[in-house]
Amino acid sequence: MDDNKKKMLESALKSIDKAFGKGTLVRLGDKEVEKIDSISTGSVGLDIALGIGGVPKGRIVEIYGPESSGKTTLTLHIIAECQKKGGVCAFVDAEHALDVKYAANLGVDVDNLYVSQPDFGEQALDIVETLAKSGAIDLVVVDSVAALTPKSEIEGDMGDQHVGLQARLMSQALRKLTGVVHKMGTTVIFINQIRMKIGQMGYGSPETTTGGNALKFYASVRLDIRRIATLKQNDESIGNRAKVKVVKNKVAPPFKVAEFDIMFGEGISKMGELVDYGVKLDIVDKSGSWFSYKDKKLGQGRENAKIYLKENPKVADEILAAIREQMGSESLSSSSDDDDIKEESGEE
């Protein structure tokens, strides 16, 4: 850069600093690149798929899928992981459907969870903004976007037309929230539902999410969760197999996929993930229906292998450490999965 341009740039920088405060505009080479911190999802596979060991801090995240696919279960696991690291969490229950007992079963410290059940959408989003601005909250979950009904719609009559009201509400709220959550390091997770596009013909997915397009743009991470199978034992349903696709990821490569078991009343099965990823990475040997690790027989059949790992947390810890080492994720090594293994096995 020639001297004349350099003087002009220095003059412009001084003017900007004077008008908006020192450090408003900085050269990236003069500033240390900040590592993006994360909150574990409670699933080893999903943490790996997200690339940074979980959902990013200080960002907006959207988790969407059909009914009973595991959206709320996944967010409750994220809350539990955040609390284990000393984080303060809030749950904005716009659907008025939070099951406190189930949340406790998943490891959520319900006594220290802040819960709000707002009357209308504007109130819910104002609460989220106030919590984020406080700088004291690490994670806010909104369940769900579809339930954020504008005040004018609630106060109106049945059958009244309210075209685009919710989309405008979300667009305005997200414009205000994005900068605040980044500055304060608060993660905001929006749970969303799926609707079918009216009159969809030809190419493209017939599905869309509620609340307009704003959330699609402002979210740093978007997770699509689906139930792909029902898990049965002796003809009795004991859980679901879930598949999560990272549809959008601004902090790591997108389009990664993770699968895990969600057991009824228990949530994500970490032992199931250890078996699956252990086999995938050749850490656990599978010969026919038998699973083994080193010289130890884990059991015949996947369910028996999971039971063995529950009863032998030291073996589970070894397999988890080997998975982390092979996947090469530094952020995973600081997650609290070891504690989860001990909890799932019943060890104190």
From Swiss-Prot:
Gene3D superfamilies documented for this protein: P-loop containing nucleotide triphosphate hydrolases
Residues annotated for ATP binding in this entry: 65-72
GO molecular function: ATP binding; ATP hydrolysis activity; ATP-dependent DNA damage sensor activity; damaged DNA binding; single-stranded DNA binding
Pfam family, one: RecA_C
Keyword Cell inner membrane attributed: no
Record key words, sorted: ATP-binding, Cytoplasm, DNA damage, DNA recombination, DNA repair, DNA-binding, Nucleotide-binding, SOS response
GO BP field: DNA recombination; DNA repair; SOS response
Region annotation Disordered: where it falls in the sequence: 326-348
Bias-annotated ranges (Acidic residues): 336-348
GO cellular component term of the entry, any: cytosol
Transmembrane annotation, as ranges: none
Localization: Cytoplasm
PANTHER family recorded: MITOCHONDRIAL DNA REPAIR PROTEIN RECA HOMOLOG-RELATED, RECA
Reported function: Can catalyze the hydrolysis of ATP in the presence of single-stranded DNA, the ATP-dependent uptake of single-stranded DNA by duplex DNA, and the ATP-dependent hybridization of homologous single-stranded DNAs. It interacts with LexA causing its activation and leading to its autocatalytic cleavage.
The family this protein is said to belong to: Belongs to the RecA family.
Name used for this protein in its record: Protein RecA
Organism: Campylobacter hominis (strain ATCC BAA-381 / DSM 21671 / CCUG 45161 / LMG 19568 / NCTC 13146 / CH001A)
Organism phylogeny: Bacteria, Pseudomonadati, Campylobacterota, Epsilonproteobacteria, Campylobacterales
Gene: recA
